[in-house]
Amino acid sequence: SSAASDVYKRQMVTKLYQASKAGVKIDIVIRGNCSLVSGIAKLSDNIRCVGIIDRYLEHSRILIFANGGKPRYFIGSADWMPRNLINRIEVLTPVYDEDMQADLLRTISYGMRDTMNGRVVDGKGGKEFVEGEPFRSQEELYKAYK
């Protein structure tokens, strides 16, 4: 799972496609643009990407790796845009605290199920929203942390 502002860099997208083809399930919550196309058979059918633009300018940099059933959690500064990956020093740091890990997982999970502002990012440029019961991730996160 990942949350980032933009997924642009060709090498990053290629690596995500390679992981998908190898059977890795990938969930991505983004705020802005994305050159990744999810849901293509035999290329990105293991990738789900949800884009959310809502009231708050929230765009977490969270990475969660399943790691064979022993999840590893990271937070970082990387925005996954070429200017940031090439011209800046970006960092990731592991998160070991279980309460913090639960918060990070909640942030990703809420984003993936946002039916009010979460649009399916599939490269078609459509406005298809995530299906399900009404759920607004930013509002629910606000309530959880209030």
What are these regions (language model features)?
Residues 11, 37-38, 83-85:
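Short helix/loop capping segments that flank catalytic or ligand/cofactor-binding pockets
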Residues 23:
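Phosphate-centric recognition/catalysis
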Residues 29-65:
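HKD-type phospholipase D/PLD-like phosphodiesterase module
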Residues 52-124:
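HKD (HxKxxxxD) catalytic microenvironment of the phospholipase D
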Residues 5, 16, 33-37, 45, ...:
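Flexible, glycine-rich loop/tail regions that form catalytic "lids" or insertion modules at the edges
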Residues 19:
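C-terminal catalytic subdomain
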Residues 26:
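Hydrophobic anchor at the start of a short beta-strand
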